[in-house]
């Protein structure tokens, strides 16, 4: 038995938790460089605002409607997500963190001693008490059904109190008959059009199809979806995320970059962040690549995009090695006379910690004390905030940095941003 817990309007809700004065007002969160809307509060959705709308086109409309806009505060969202997930882990035997605002919970054995709907309400109340965030809870025998139950809990929140238990077969079928097939988890737009052409309009229609025919005309993934809709578990709970095969750190610049030194600072920063992520995965890498590009949509400007890569003989997780390799790649592809829109660093060819072997012919032998130095670097930046300790090459006044003109305070991770109570 699974429960899917999903925070309602997560990004927007994180902003309003610390701003009670915004209660009842429409709130939107913008993407990198304040480009477009990526999250809306319920009040904003009622005004017809949808994710993907360019901010510069809607700016005047937002002003007239009293919409409050925020730049993306990823540090705040990550910490609030961690608080939600920690709460869930205390309440259920196992948790799979599916995304920043969603988690599948294992309810095996819970129904033997608790009513599942009551337990769902307890999850909701506990998360609300500890984080002031509201979650929808969908309970069912499979992940796919739990997704649909969660969808119903949020769509009909007033009638369901935010909790839907689909363990009853009759209730399952009634809900499946109401859900369009395109709203089923794992059914994309292209597949849903093909299903509609075959007369399969609802989730119930899909659940009643022959698995053999579905597999023959579509694929094994959709066959699993059909089985899951019938209450047959095909997707197990994954407590540990699979090891990453690559790490990419890139951003569009707040302003176009034309100066090599500014680009070098950006590549320094992206490489340092990628190395930090690599150590967080307990991995070493051999492949380091840097890319730069101008905007493909710029008028009267020639497009330029290029990348270069370095393969090390000995795997590393030292920021200094990765930065040096990334800058060497930049030197190969940098061309004067362009207005660059974006750059990034990619790491690949990973080795697990303790598996990496030295190479007799490698001129760049591992640095003495590298592991301890990187540990201190990561510890200070985790304890006192990102950027507490950084490389000089990253620069101090980063003109190229991502534009976030409406950034809220990092209320939960920076002492300087703690709320002051009068």
Curated annotation (Swiss-Prot):
GO BP terms in the entry: error-prone translesion synthesis; SOS response
Gene3D superfamilies: 3.30.70.270, 3.40.1170.60, 5' to 3' exonuclease, C-terminal subdomain, DNA polymerase, Y-family, little finger domain
Keyword Amino-acid biosynthesis applies: no
Similarity-based family: Belongs to the DNA polymerase type-Y family.
Protein function: Involved in UV protection and mutation. Essential for induced (or SOS) mutagenesis. May modify the DNA replication machinery to allow bypass synthesis across a damaged template.
NCBIfam families, per database record: PRK03609.1 (NF002955)
UniProt protein name: Protein UmuC
Organism annotation: Salmonella typhimurium (strain LT2 / SGSC1412 / ATCC 700720)
């Amino acid at each position: 038995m699974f429960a899917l817990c999903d925070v309602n309007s997560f990004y927007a809700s994180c902003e309003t938790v610390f701003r009670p004065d915004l209660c009842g007002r429409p709130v939107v969160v913008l993407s990198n460089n304040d480009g477009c809307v990526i999250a809306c509060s319920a009040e904003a959705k009622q005004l017809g605002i949808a994710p993907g709308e360019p901010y510069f086109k809607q700016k005047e409309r937002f002003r007239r409607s009293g919409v409050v806009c925020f730049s993306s505060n990823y540090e705040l969202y990550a910490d609030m997500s961690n608080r939600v997930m920690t709460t869930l882990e205390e309440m259920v035997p196992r948790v799979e963190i599916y995304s920043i605002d969603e988690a599948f919970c294992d309810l095996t054995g819970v129904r033997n001693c608790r009513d599942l709907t009551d337990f769902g309400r307890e999850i909701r109340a506990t998360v609300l008490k500890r984080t002031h965030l509201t979650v929808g809870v969908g309970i069912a025998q499979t992940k796919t059904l739990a997704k649909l139950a969660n969808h119903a809990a949020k769509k009909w929140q007033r009638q369901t109190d935010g909790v839907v238990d689909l363990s009853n077969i009759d209730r399952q079928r009634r809900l499946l008959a109401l859900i369009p097939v395109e709203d089923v988890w794992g059914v994309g737009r292209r597949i849903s059009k093909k299903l509609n052409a075959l007369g399969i309009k609802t989730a119930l229609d899909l659940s009643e199809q022959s698995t053999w025919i579905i597999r023959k005309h579509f694929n094994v993934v959709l066959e699993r979806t059909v089985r899951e809709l019938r209450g047959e578990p095909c997707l197990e709970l994954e407590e540990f995320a699979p090891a990453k095969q690559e790490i990419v750190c890139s951003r569009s610049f707040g302003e176009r970059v034309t100066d090599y030194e500014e680009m070098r600072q950006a590549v320094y920063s992206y490489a340092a962040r990628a190395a930090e992520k690599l150590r967080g995965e307990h991995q070493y890498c051999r492949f380091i690549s840097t890319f730069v590009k101008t905007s493909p949509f710029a008028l009267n400007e020639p497009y330029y995009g290029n990348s270069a890569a370095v393969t090390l003989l000995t795997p590393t997780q030292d920021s200094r090695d990765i930065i040096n390799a990334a800058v060497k790649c930049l030197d190969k592809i940098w061309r004067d006379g362009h207005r660059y829109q974006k750059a990034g660093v990619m790491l690949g060819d990973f080795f697990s910690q303790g598996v990496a072997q030295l190479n007799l012919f490698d001129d760049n032998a591992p640095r003495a004390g590298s592991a301890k130095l990187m540990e201190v670097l990561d510890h200070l930046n985790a304890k006192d905030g990102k950027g507490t300790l950084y490389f000089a090459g990253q620069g101090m006044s980063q003109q190229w940095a991502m534009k976030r003109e409406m950034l809220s305070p990092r209320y939960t991770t920076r002492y300087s941003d703690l709320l002051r109570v009068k």
